[in-house]
Amino acid sequence: MTTNYIFVTGGVVSSLGKGIAAASLAAILEARGLNVTIMKLDPYINVDPGTMSPIQHGEVFVTEDGAETDLDLGHYERFIRTKMSRRNNFTTGRIYSDVLRKERRGDYLGATVQVIPHITNAIKERVLEGGEGHDVVLVEIGGTVGDIESLPFLEAIRQMAVEIGREHTLFMHLTLVPYMAAAGEVKTKPTQHSVKELLSIGIQPDILICRSDRAVPANERAKIALFCNVPEKAVISLKDVDSIYKIPGLLKSQGLDDYICKRFSLNCPEANLSEWEQVIYEEANPAGEVTIGMVGKYIELPDAYKSVIEALKHGGLKNRVTVNIKLIDSQDVETRGVEILKDLDAILIPGGFGYRGVEGKIATARYARENNIPYLGICLGMQVALIEFARNVAGMDNANSTEFVPDCKYPVVALITEWRDEDGNVEVRSEKSDLGGTMRLGAQQCQLNDDSLVRQLYGAPTIVERHRHRYEVNNMLLKQIEAAGLRVAGRSGDDQLVEIIEVPNHPWFVACQFHPEFTSTPRDGHPLFAGFVKAASEHQKRQAK
């Protein structure tokens, strides 16, 4: 089987939406019966985004196999059925790290190690490895053409086009076509300059995606085609839309998938986008709306919680309601009190690291529990709910996590490797287990209790969800908390670790150690988010009586 490659680049400005455009095109090709995957090549020197600030980079998306990756991989999984893995995302830092390791081992036999050919060869090897077994691979190059950081990646894909052959490679370039209000027209010159920049490094784009706040007129597209040496039918207008799920239909209506299939000599049926039409219909025809408060510490950049925000919207689609998300800084809860949480239909506390704002999250969990407000805690959101219950219901004053207070009296949450037994001795778990040292990453099994709410929601006794955390519930202190009324609703496959907790005498109080947002999609939703949004609607109705 021959694999075909579509290399996606961006020009003029960043944040044009390369990831969404690539994912939308992949969705159309998948709807034609093709086996499609998408890769993201990031030019930054960090080995992966795992240690990067969410305020700078946005969320870290965790794949099934435990890779910490760019948030664009979340878009890819929400648009296509193919699951991403560590092969779908790599950085300049990862490439240099691999090459330097080989150089130290002597793999290059004393050669002078250079960007060309050693770095570019390493990039090509990873792209080819990631594309194995697929009909079409879309490869998104991060950054903007002209950035010094992107040059090795652009050189590598130029070489790939020569080596694989132009009959199996396409270059798709996204560019900005701005509207000048003073002139009353769109301007094509930035696009021409961007293509000129690409040509200077040996890449002739085959497809141009023209991003604008309005449809680019046919005469302007013809002008772009003429000056950029691209067929007119391959100049695609991609205007701003109110829903990203309209983009597959927008690209298909301009024949982009037909053009690509002809170029690659692929014989495949017409794309059936009925599932996407259903998503658009559900989004456009809500029967009501709810307001959900999300209490976190990175709220100045909503992309830090991208998958959670999308998953809440998916939960709205499944309940035919619009979800209005109110982002609340947990430090504001500390300084202004829980009064700022009034008038919410439900409360969600997402994952996070570090002590800043934690007491505000603990106060939020207490407010939701005591006032019967639907609550969903994710990762740290589960840990603060447990700490709150231990303090205020189980009589464990000053209970905390060793992440925040290492020598606290009741360490109800502790590092995976540092639980204390009943005699006060530190119990160390095996580092050889799949928990992986200090960070638990990737998809793992969870067994649900038959009498739990989550068992009803999932409709299955065993689930698989993705993790990203260092700290766990301390089993040695669990009996006292359970005796006070907290229910452990789910445990890890080996029955060792607490995965889900519930408050039984509450309309809807669920908190999980894993990240359910990473497996939610617009077409299928997710049981926890669908149930949470439904609970928000029911709470709203109760309050209205």
Curated annotation (Swiss-Prot):
InterPro entries membership: Class_I_gatase-like, CTP_synthase, CTP_synthase_N, GATASE, GATase1_CTP_Synthase, P-loop_NTPase
Regulation of protein activity: Allosterically activated by GTP, when glutamine is the substrate; GTP has no effect on the reaction when ammonia is the substrate. The allosteric effector GTP functions by stabilizing the protein conformation that binds the tetrahedral intermediate(s) formed during glutamine hydrolysis. Inhibited by the product CTP, via allosteric rather than competitive inhibition.
This protein's pathway: Pyrimidine metabolism; CTP biosynthesis via de novo pathway; CTP from UDP: step 2/2
Domain Glutamine amidotransferase type-1 positions: 291-542
Amino acids binding Mg(2+): 72, 140
Annotated ATP binding sites: 15-20, 72, 239-241
Binding site for UTP: 14, 187-192, 223
Sequence positions that bind L-glutamine: 352, 380-383, 403, 470
Enzyme class, broadest EC rank: ligase
Catalytic activity: UTP + L-glutamine + ATP + H2O = CTP + L-glutamate + ADP + phosphate + 2 H(+); L-glutamine + H2O = L-glutamate + NH4(+); UTP + NH4(+) + ATP = CTP + ADP + phosphate + 2 H(+)
Residue numbers annotated as active site: 379 (nucleophile), 515, 517
Residue positions binding CTP: 14, 147-149, 187-192, 223
PROSITE patterns for the chain: GATASE_TYPE_1
Region annotation (Amidoligase domain) ranges: 1-266
Listed GO MF terms: ATP binding; CTP synthase activity; glutaminase activity; identical protein binding; metal ion binding
Cellular component GO terms, alphabetical: cytosol
EC number(s) per entry: 6.3.4.2
GO BP annotation list: 'de novo' CTP biosynthetic process; pyrimidine nucleobase biosynthetic process
Domain of life the protein comes from: Bacteria
UniProtKB keywords: ATP-binding, Glutamine amidotransferase, Ligase, Magnesium, Metal-binding, Nucleotide-binding, Pyrimidine biosynthesis
Additional remarks: CTPSs have evolved a hybrid strategy for distinguishing between UTP and CTP. The overlapping regions of the product feedback inhibitory and substrate sites recognize a common feature in both compounds, the triphosphate moiety. To differentiate isosteric substrate and product pyrimidine rings, an additional pocket far from the expected kinase/ligase catalytic site, specifically recognizes the cytosine and ribose portions of the product inhibitor.
Subunit annotation: Homotetramer.
Family: Belongs to the CTP synthase family.
Functional summary from the UniProt entry: Catalyzes the ATP-dependent amination of UTP to CTP with either L-glutamine or ammonia as the source of nitrogen. Regulates intracellular CTP levels through interactions with the four ribonucleotide triphosphates.
Protein name per the record: CTP synthase
Organism in which the protein naturally occurs: Salmonella arizonae (strain ATCC BAA-731 / CDC346-86 / RSK2980)
Gene field: pyrG
